[in-house]
């Protein structure tokens, strides 16, 4: 990860929010993550806007590395046993050495030891975030490390799901996003397509019956995630039918 923008605790939350927004507009996501990390370290509960900035920043910082890793992993499999195999493995390792510390950086944020003091929506958001970043670790790890990250991802997602089912409407974008990512976890990490389909279908079916009640401010986000759930179900459908 490139050097994050220098932010200090003396910066106010408002200054950090504005800096993060400017960095996002400039697509300087390392700078955005630096501002958001400082904000998270100030000890105050982040509001909805601040949490979303944090999520967007690290998602984009990590996104390019995850894409690179997937490409290099595919190339490495094709080149196994060829003269280029060693060079490809070295490059794949380099990408992993950038990707893993970013995940660990997120998981070490002081907001993630989740306390009873924060609201239900914030708890769900952070448990989901933990589940996502442990999943990203599991994608690139092997052996015991993979087992630990997989277990931690599943545990965090289950906690988030239990809270979401009790506290959020079936059309809430955080609840839908959680269902989307948890189903991807079962499909890609645990190799359980039937479980992935069941989870995604339940979330989509519940939301579609309430689609007319979605609030205007969340309509775009909610319907986009519903479309992603449906796209995955279409993609996974043949495997789910085979496993049934």
Swiss-Prot record:
InterPro entries: 14-3-3 (IPR000308), 14-3-3_CS (IPR023409), 14-3-3_dom_sf (IPR036815), 14-3-3_domain (IPR023410). It comes from the Eukaryota. Pfam families: 14-3-3. PROSITE patterns: 1433_1, 1433_2. SUPFAM superfamilies: 14-3-3 protein (SSF48445). Gene3D superfamilies: 14-3-3 domain. Belongs to the 14-3-3 family. This is 14-3-3 protein homolog 1.
């Amino acid at each position: 990860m490139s050097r994050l923008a220098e932010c200090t605790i003396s910066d106010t939350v408002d200054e950090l929010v504005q800096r993060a927004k400017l960095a996002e507009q400039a697509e300087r996501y390392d700078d955005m993550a630096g501002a958001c990390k400082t904000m998270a370290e100030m000890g105050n509960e982040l509001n909805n806007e601040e949490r979303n900035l944090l999520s967007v920043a690290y998602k984009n910082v990590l996104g390019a590395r995850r894409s690179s890793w997937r490409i290099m992993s595919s190339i490495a499999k094709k080149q196994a046993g060829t003269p280029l195999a060693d060079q490809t493995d070295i490059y794949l390792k380099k990408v992993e050495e950038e990707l893993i510390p970013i995940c660990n950086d997120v998981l070490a944020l002081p907001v993630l030891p989740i306390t009873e003091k924060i609201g239900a929506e914030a708890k769900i958001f952070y448990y989901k975030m933990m589940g996502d970043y442990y999943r990203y670790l599991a994608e690139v790890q092997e052996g015991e490390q993979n087992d630990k990250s997989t277990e931690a991802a599943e545990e965090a997602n289950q906690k988030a799901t239990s809270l979401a089912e009790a506290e959020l409407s079936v059309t809430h974008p955080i609840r839908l996003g959680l269902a989307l990512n948890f189903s991807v976890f079962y499909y890609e990490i645990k190799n359980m397509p039937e479980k992935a389909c069941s989870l995604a279908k339940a979330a989509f079916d519940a939301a579609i019956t309430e689609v007319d009640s979605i609030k205007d401010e969340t309509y775009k986000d909610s319907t986009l995630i519903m479309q992603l759930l449906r796209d995955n179900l279409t993609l996974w459908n043949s495997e789910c039918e085979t496993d049934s």
